[in-house]
Amino acid sequence: GLDEVIVVSTFSSEQSDVVPRLGAATAGYLARCLGDQQVLDLSWGSTLLAVVDALAPQNLPELRVVQMLGGLGRLESETYGADLTMRMAQTLGARMRLLPSPGIVSSKLVRDALLEDVNIAETLALAARADLAVVGIGSPIAGSLVTETGILRVSELVELRAMGAVGDIALRFFDGDGQAVDHPVNDRIIGLDLAQIRHIP
């Protein structure tokens, strides 16, 4: 169950109004929760950009900020996971651990080969032991960030919806009961899976 819920009031349902308020609320929550010796996972997306923008500077030199999903979207994008991880670590005066790989690759064969790299494997192992994770929740609809940035094809989102997908966390799609949707895209992702994410407090 949930230990704490923060309700954010907005004047409209427009993303330009909702996202900054979500970011500020999350940044405030993190200010209460973060401490040295912790591991903080970070995914990617426009909401997480708002969180990073709203964070107040801190000095947490033993905190480690870890990129939990490989790079997605355009390299110059502000919502790119590595950029968000670096910015958050700098703001918090913390150390960072980047995941040196794409977030999604062309095949399971490529994914499996990359997972044998020691740097990738060690980063994912550290991410799996995190004390806290900051993630966005995506929606499998045309026009979402995953299609706008070319990460997934619209046809793949159609397939995912047909299989019951209602959202995703770090590209791991889930159904209305919160269970993982078994789609071939899972075999191409370099990042934590839903089972690992669930074990993060």
Specify the residue positions occupied by each region the protein language model found.
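Conserved phosphate- and dinucleotide-binding cores of soluble alpha/beta proteins
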Residues: 71-201
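N-terminal active-site beta-alpha-beta segment that forms phosphate/nucleotide-binding
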Residues: 1-108
